[in-house]
Amino acid sequence: MDNALPEPEPLIALIEALRRLPGVGARSARRMAYHLLQHDVQGADMLGRALAGAVQNLRRCARCNSFTEDDVCVICANPKRDASLLCIVETPADQNVIESSHGYRGLYYVLMGRLAPLEGVGPRELDFQRVLDRAADGLVQEVILATNFTAEGETTAHFLGEALAERGLKVTRLARGVPAGSELEYVDAGTIAWALMERRAT
């Protein structure tokens, strides 16, 4: 017999919404919800407005697929960036880590994911054809594969590396200074800068 206190529908909806965040289970989501409603109503309102604003105002960059307010993001629109270098990453968070290392002045393409066949994520879901078309724009001379050093990231890098090499492009991979099994988002900027400088051909 379930003696748990019945929760109002709006509270249940908030908890379920918070559970969508990575690494957040039912218990953590419930704690977050109660904290916001009990101790930080202003913060809850700010969070709601910020989320709504982001969903409404952000779009995908027409060039690199990252988030932007305009058709083309500030990096792609910067004429001082090296258009001969294209760095492929899994997420905007990975892009941000590489950018903060100050060791890269080229352009990016953000996959917004990685190959994960067991989860139903294949080349079509990641629109690999768009990636290949972007790399074959006539300006790109080297493609740096900066996917994570996880099983899925390595599979993604291998698949893309072969397809790009078939098109005559130079393809390199971050050096192994980045620990195996790690995600770029959690690697320090110095290690990322070294891995970029010491990148190797695939």
From Swiss-Prot:
MF terms (GO), sorted A to Z:
DNA binding; zinc ion binding
SMART domains the record matches: TOPRIM
Entries under SUPFAM superfamilies matching the protein:
Recombination protein RecR
Keyword terms of this UniProt record: DNA damage, DNA recombination, DNA repair, Metal-binding, Zinc, Zinc-finger
For the Toprim domain, which residue ranges apply?
84-179
Gene Ontology process terms (BP): DNA recombination; DNA repair
* Superkingdom of source: Bacteria
Q: Where are the zinc fingers (C4-type)?
A: 61-76
HAMAP family in the record, alphabetically?
Answer: RecR
Annotated NCBIfam families: recR
Summary of the function given for this chain in its UniProt record: May play a role in DNA repair. It seems to be involved in an RecBC-independent recombinational process of DNA repair. It may act with RecF and RecO.
Q: Which family does it belong to?
A: Belongs to the RecR family.
Which protein is depicted? Answer: Recombination protein RecR
| Name of the gene this protein is made from | recR
